[in-house]
């Protein structure tokens, strides 16, 4: 139990009619440590208890008896709590040393499934930095939900269907070279895609020709299907090589095409529930009662189905297959209206489980303030970017520690981790400007900074030949170690908050804070001095390293023992 919950439960024993959540929301951290570690203002109880806040505070302070507190005192209308730092430090350190990497593991999910729609790059287009956010946010959320007892199901809903394949087929038939595509599939397909889009801007017939080829593809035309399958196979090989490098795995690669034969059922269900309305020859579902102005366009006048029809089929399939407790879609902010429509249509179909579906939006990655666009050829490709990040990490490692073993492996962990961490430390709904130099820096709020703090602690533990033991009586009450203890004690709650808000940045910011606190402690403390507290200081180091490593793991980032 963290200190806030400990205090809230003690106050509730004295004031049982007050909800613990209310008490928690009222607790304050005094500006001056001489006023205690936490304070409870009694103003809100004055009306119900019909007493002055000062008297209420005094009554509460007198009735609280716990060996977790050095003292509890009333100062005016406030109850000030002074925690027994030595006792709490000992408890926290023993818990982490006992649990190891399992520290802060919880069973909130009770093994229930969480379906996570993530990554979902478009076939025949390069894997760009734009796809990175969905990939790393989804992967981190999977780790976070797993940590609190859910079973994550990671779904790569590949963009392997749509009019863009009509465009690509037209481009390939006009200018394509089979040998060139086989040698460098993604590069060549991107060139074709950019070229055909440029031509379409001045020649309207290109769009019509692309639509015709896509209609052929929907009708299983052999030539169209063969080209589509080839584009898909080549792209997947490329993507999987990158996923391996990023250490990201999936449970399903069922993309848009997988649902081609599952959309008729959606149309039949909508018709049977009398939800389809004709509008200008198209079939729509009105959603005004949900405050959604524009109806959901289910089927166009030419008979072509739409993105939402496919997503309805996917939602039904996932509920039947995984019986999810939560289904989350890690997709950009720009798709918010689409997901509101998707949930509303399912609600209209009387599927109350649609309440368990959540769009987890995120902001854009820009470069020099400019939006990235594959269509316009303004794109940062992930593969060369990762390679450059690894090279930059290798250069810094060479300068810091030229005799390091496994330099290449460490550089890989630092370079890849730097890109992931920089993305995940940003509040999800905000965008960020891509800056590789800032990402790979060992200074500031970066992945390498946190990794280096972990490696520094491992070096201390190796020098001391420390092995964790629960038999020792650890006791620390200095200011710097107490700041670390409070953070470590808070880690279980931090993980739950990250899950509740679908927000990995909460973990990333926690890791930065913990690394900063340790570095401050390291600068002020002679950790290896042979005195009565050495085992306690080393236990604190071990616990800090354990929690730093686990924080990084939840973000999908490795923590090397040496850098």
From Swiss-Prot:
**Does the keyword section mention ATP-binding?**
yes
Substrates-to-products reaction catalysed: tRNA(Arg) + L-arginine + ATP = L-arginyl-tRNA(Arg) + AMP + diphosphate
UniProt motif ('HIGH' region) ranges: 121-131
UniProt keyword annotations, A-Z? Aminoacyl-tRNA synthetase, ATP-binding, Cytoplasm, Ligase, Nucleotide-binding, Protein biosynthesis
Gene Ontology MF: a single term = arginine-tRNA ligase activity
Instruction: Give the matching CDD domains.
Output: Anticodon_Ia_Arg, ArgRS_core
Q: What is its EC number?
A: 6.1.1.19
Q: Which SMART domains match?
A: Arg_tRNA_synt_N, DALR_1
Could you name the Gene Ontology cellular component terms for this entry? cytoplasm
InterPro entries assigned: Arg-tRNA-ligase, Arg-tRNA-synth_N, Arg-tRNA-synth_N_sf, ArgRS_core, DALR_anticod-bd, Rossmann-like_a/b/a_fold, tRNAsynth_Ia_anticodon-bd
Main localization of the protein? cytoplasm
* Compartment annotation: Cytoplasm
Q: Which Pfam families has this protein been placed in? A: Arg_tRNA_synt_N, DALR_1, tRNA-synt_1d
Q: Is the Aminoacyl-tRNA synthetase keyword given for this protein? A: yes
Chain ranges passing through the membrane: none
Q: What class of enzyme is it?
A: ligase
Q: List the disulfide bonds.
A: none
The biological processes this protein is annotated with in GO are: arginyl-tRNA aminoacylation
What is stated as this protein's family in its record? Belongs to the class-I aminoacyl-tRNA synthetase family.
- Which NCBIfam families does the annotation name? argS (TIGR00456)
Subunit structure, as described in the record: Monomer.
What's the protein here called?
A: Arginine--tRNA ligase
| Source species of the chain | Streptococcus agalactiae serotype V (strain ATCC BAA-611 / 2603 V/R)
């Amino acid at each position: 139990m963290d200190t806030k919950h400990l205090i809230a439960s003690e106050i509730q024993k004295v004031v049982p009619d007050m909800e613990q959540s209310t008490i928690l929301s009222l607790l304050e951290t005094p500006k001056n440590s001489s006023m205690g570690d936490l304070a409870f203002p009694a103003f809100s109880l004055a009306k119900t208890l019909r007493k002055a806040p000062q008297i209420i505070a005094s009554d509460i302070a007198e009735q609280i008896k716990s060996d977790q507190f050095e003292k509890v005192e009333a100062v005016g209308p406030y109850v000030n709590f002074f925690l027994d730092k030595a006792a709490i430090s000992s408890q926290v350190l023993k818990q982490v040393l006992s649990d190891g990497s399992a520290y802060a593991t919880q069973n909130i999910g009770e093994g229930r499934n969480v379906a996570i729609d993530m990554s979902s790059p478009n076939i025949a287009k390069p894997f760009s930095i734009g796809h990175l956010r969905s990939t790393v946010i989804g992967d981190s959320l999977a780790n976070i939900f797993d940590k609190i007892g859910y079973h994550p199901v990671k779904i790569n809903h590949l963009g392997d269907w749509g009019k863009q394949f009509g465009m690509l087929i037209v481009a390939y038939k006009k200018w394509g070279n089979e040998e060139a595509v086989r040698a460098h599939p993604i590069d060549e397909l991107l060139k074709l895609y950019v070229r055909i889009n440029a031509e379409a801007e001045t020649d309207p017939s290109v769009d019509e020709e692309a639509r015709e080829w896509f209609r052929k593809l929907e009708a299983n035309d052999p030539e169209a299907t063969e080209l589509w399958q080839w584009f898909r196979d080549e792209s997947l090989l490329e993507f999987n090589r990158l996923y391996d490098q990023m250490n990201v795995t999936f449970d399903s690669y069922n993309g848009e095409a997988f649902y081609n034969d599952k959309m008729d059922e959606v149309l039949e269900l909508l018709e049977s529930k009398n939800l389809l309305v004709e509008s200008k020859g198209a079939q729509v579902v009105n959603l005004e009662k949900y405050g959604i102005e524009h109806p959901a366009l289910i089927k166009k006048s030419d008979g072509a189905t739409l993105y939402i029809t496919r997503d309805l089929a996917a939602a039904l399939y996932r509920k039947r297959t995984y019986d999810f407790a939560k289904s989350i879609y890690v997709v950009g902010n720009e798709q918010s209206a689409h997901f509101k429509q998707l949930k509303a249509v399912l609600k209209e179909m009387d599927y109350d489980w649609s309440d368990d579906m959540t769009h987890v939006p995120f902001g854009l990655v820009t470069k020099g303030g400019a939006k990235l666009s594959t269509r316009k050829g303004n794109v940062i490709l992930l593969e060369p970017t990762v390679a450059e990040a690894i090279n930059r990490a290798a250069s810094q490692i060479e300068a810091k520690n030229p005799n390091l073993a496994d330099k290449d492996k460490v550089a890989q962990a630092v370079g890849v981790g730097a890109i992931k961490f920089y993305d995940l430390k940003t509040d999800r709904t905000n965008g960020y400007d891509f800056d590789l130099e800032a990402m790979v820096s060992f200074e500031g709020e970066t992945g390498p900074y946190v990794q280096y703090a972990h490696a520094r602690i491992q070096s201390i533990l190796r020098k001391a030949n420390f092995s964790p033991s629960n038999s020792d009586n650890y006791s620390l009450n200095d200011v710097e170690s107490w700041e670390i203890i409070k953070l470590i004690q808070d880690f279980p709650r931090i993980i739950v908050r990250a899950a509740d808000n679908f927000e990995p940045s909460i973990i990333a910011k926690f890791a930065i804070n913990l690394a900063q606190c340790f570095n401050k402690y390291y600068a002020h403390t002679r950790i290896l001095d042979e005195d009565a507290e050495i085992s306690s200081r080393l236990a604190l180091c071990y616990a800090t390293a354990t929690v730093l490593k686990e924080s990084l793991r939840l973000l999908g980032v490795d923590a090397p023992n040496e850098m």
